[in-house]
Amino acid sequence: MQGLYIKSYGCQMNVYDSLIIENIIKPLGFSIVNELSEADIVILNTCHIREKAAEKLYSELGRIRKIQETKNLTIVVAGCVAQAEGTEIFTRAPFVDIVVGPQSIHTLPELIVKARKIKKQIINIDFPVISKFDAIAVEEYTKNQKVSAFISVQEGCNKFCSFCVVPYTRGEEYSRTVEAIFKEALILADSGIKEITLIGQNVNAYHGTYKGNEWDLGRLIQHIAKISSIERIYYTTSHPRDMHESLYEAHGIEKKLIPFIHLPVQSGSNKILRKMNRKHTAEEYINIIKTLRKHRSDIAYSSDFIVGFPGETDEDFENTIRLIEEVKFSQAYSFKYSPRPGTPSAEYTSQIPDEIKSQRLTKLQELVHKQQLEFNKKMIGETHPVLFYKKGKFDNQIIGKTPYMQSCYINTENPDLYYNKIVPIKITDAHKNHLTGIIPHTLPV
């Protein structure tokens, strides 16, 4: 068997794509290796969202090149940097053998065989008419998922936010059929999966078909919830413009849908939201939060924030701070704005000095971290169901997730007893990024 090394960067969709890549290449005579030195093929599944993504890729390729000089090594660049950079990758790294975009990964077995045979560089960054989901048997991308599994229900984005590369690297919105998604969920359930995460670049824009009728995400969630052995359902990432009534209702009706939503707002300033082309206002976002709370009062919120967007004034930034104070997030991801080549905002004037970006980021993160700790501390003394999915770094430690997406650590004499199980845990302590707890004495083993 030859060695296959895959490194995945960025979002959950890339993790999902890497699983597909692994399972369609293994039949060529490969097995997964964890060390570059053991690899015969290296695949870098890249992300293009953040600053200097391409430079990080070339730096990584430089390290891999040193290994290639000592052995016959096929190097593949996949993912969104591959889509964005295209043949520029061959120019800057002529030792790369294959460049393949995220919508063409299903062609990788053919590309690998061909590249090794003809000894020439090959590129495929098309947006094919036949999607990767239609080209690959569903059984091939459900393998190797353990406790919690991803199902891609939607890809691409039609929103064209002025800072974002996704519409250019992932293409327009595409939704899989209900039948295909449900079949995948059934296979995962039969393999012992307890939690399913429905993923998409703009997942709540889902509009798949079932027997000729269009379904939205709320209806899809309630359909998947009928699978008895699936105990938790989560979806990410959402856009405020695509929140809809049946999704609100699903949060109120479907107990398997966890009380947590990641709903990026990016800014609390309407001026900046317009410049970002977000197509919603801060007030509309707040109303979405209020509507969700009417349907389920204990729901927790996560968001993304960009500070230092071109033209952002102190007042604009303070509007973001006020929004955070009003919503009270349990988690948030925040970043300094960085121009992405090819996006409209990269050409905007009034770029913000990095020093100011850093100051604003620090202030925002201090507030978010304070809210996160306060949210976690409210759990102390309460008992919550925790899904345990991996061992901790210490002996007898096991790590799980609460329904609010908090990591929870417990110590037990037999961690294996609780793996892939949902167990009531009494929370004894809280930190910014995790909880600790104990198994109540009344719980039968």
UniProtKB/Swiss-Prot annotation:
UniProt binding sites for [4Fe-4S] cluster 1: C11, C47, C80
GO terms, molecular function: 4 iron, 4 sulfur cluster binding; metal ion binding; N6-isopentenyladenosine methylthiotransferase activity
InterPro entries: Elp3/MiaA/NifB-like_rSAM, Methylthiotransferase, Methylthiotransferase_CS, Methylthiotransferase_N, Methylthiotransferase_N_sf, MiaB_methiolase, rSAM, rSAM_horseshoe
Domain TRAM: 377-441
Chain ranges passing through the membrane: none
Cofactor comment text: Binds 2 [4Fe-4S] clusters. One cluster is coordinated with 3 cysteines and an exchangeable S-adenosyl-L-methionine.
Residues at which [4Fe-4S] cluster 2 binds: C157, C161, C164
UniProt name for this protein: tRNA-2-methylthio-N(6)-dimethylallyladenosine synthase
Gene of this entry: miaB
